[in-house]
């Protein structure tokens, strides 16, 4: 299981990656919030750096990675 911390503080669990049907070149990341809500966003956005408090930081930073 992989867990990521969003730059605003939320913790999310990686569910899977998927190919967008309408454009097979786009990899979508599927992830779950602590309250169970499922979210998805393009991999290019999930893994990008954003500006936060004057610094470039990852949108999602890996905080836990384990093999089940």
Regions found by a protein language model. Give the residues of each.
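Mixed-charge, low-complexity intrinsically disordered regions
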Residues: 1-68
